[in-house]
Design a protein with these regions (language model features):
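Feature for soluble, non-membrane regions of globular proteins
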Residues: 1-170
Length: 170
């Protein structure tokens, strides 16, 4: 439901950006067969030279985070999450915490995981070392600039308002 707060042009631009990352990874994957079907956790144990591991750890988490981002939103209907309300007191309190966590980050992803845990990830190499997020908000300029220009705060408020909080589990 990105269309709730992003234009078709912006969505197409962002999906093209994600496609370029996926293309770079597929080229790396074609040259290193051991990457085929590997998850982020696998990249730490595979026998790769340092440069190939660094490249894979830079690209694969971004692919996964963009996939999560593109599926993180919905048309808002309240209440959206009993779990979030029980952990944080209200959805508004949770969204306010997310906003405060993300407002200072100049790039990366705001990720939300099980139990409504959240963090801002700016180091893609370590982003998904433990668990994949349930929801993600892209904080980089390519995510919002066509529609919001330099008004990043307005993008962030709109994105947070449309998060599909029902996807959050324990």
């Amino acid at each position: 439901m990105l269309r709730e707060f992003l234009s078709e042009e912006n969505i197409a631009f962002h999906k093209e950006y994600a496609r370029q990352i996926r293309l770079k990874y597929s080229i790396l994957e074609a040259s290193l067969k051991e990457l085929t079907g590997a998850g982020v956790k696998d990249l730490y144990r595979l026998k790769l030279d340092d440069r190939d591991r660094a490249d894979a750890l830079e690209l694969l988490p971004q692919i996964i985070l963009h996939d999560v981002f593109f599926s993180s939103f919905c048309e808002c209907r309240y209440p959206r999450s009993v779990l979030v309300s029980s952990v944080y007191g209200s959805e508004a309190a949770f969204l306010n915490r997310l906003y405060k966590a993300a407002e200072g980050a100049q790039f990366g992803f705001l990720i939300i995981g099980r139990g409504a845990s959240y963090s801002v990830v700016t180091d893609y190499k370590r982003a998904l070392r433990y668990d994949e997020p349930l929801l993600a908000v892209d904080l980089c300029e390519h995510a919002y600039f066509l529609d919001y220009g330099f008004d990043r705060e307005r993008y962030l408020v709109s994105a947070l308002f449309h998060l599909d909080l029902k996807k959050i589990t324990i």
